[in-house]
C-alpha cells in the first residue's frame, strides 16, 4: 500500500506524518538516539535530494508545505517517508529572484522551515547535507548542462514556435533560445554561489 499526502499548511499536518514532524520540530534532534528514530521514519536520501535540488535550482517559491510525501506501508516495507520534487516554475533563472546568485537559504520557505531547522541541529545531518550539495555542484556543471540542453533545445525549437503561433502566444524562437541561454548561464555560475551560502 502506498500512502500519499499533500502537505499544505502547518496547521493541517496529516496525522500519519505528524509523529515524524513533531519528533523533528519539537524534539532534541542533536542527540544520536533521537536522530536514529528520525532516520527510521524518513528516507534521508530522498529528503536530501528534495531539499538540495530546490536550493540548487533556486526555487524561490519553494516551501516545505507545498510538497507531496509518500511511503509504502504494510508488511515488509520500511514505512519511511519520501519527498517529491514538485513545482519548479520559478527555478533556473526564470525570474529575477531565482537567478544563479540567489541565496535560496534566505527565502522564507527555507528560513522558516521548522523541519529543516530541527534537522540542522544534528551534526550528522549537517555533514550529509553539505556532502549532497557538493555532489550537486560537481555533477551539475556548465558542460553537462550544455551537453544535455543543446540537443533538447533544438529538438523542441520548431514545436515551441509552432505552438506559440497556433495559440497566439508571445513566445518567439529567439525568446525560446534566450531562455535556453539563461538556463545554461545559470549552471555555469550556480555552483560558485551555492557553496558560499
Model regions: which residues?
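Conserved ATP-binding subdomain of kinase catalytic cores across diverse folds
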Residues: 1-11
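Middle-to-C-terminal accessory/interaction subdomains
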Residues: 9-197
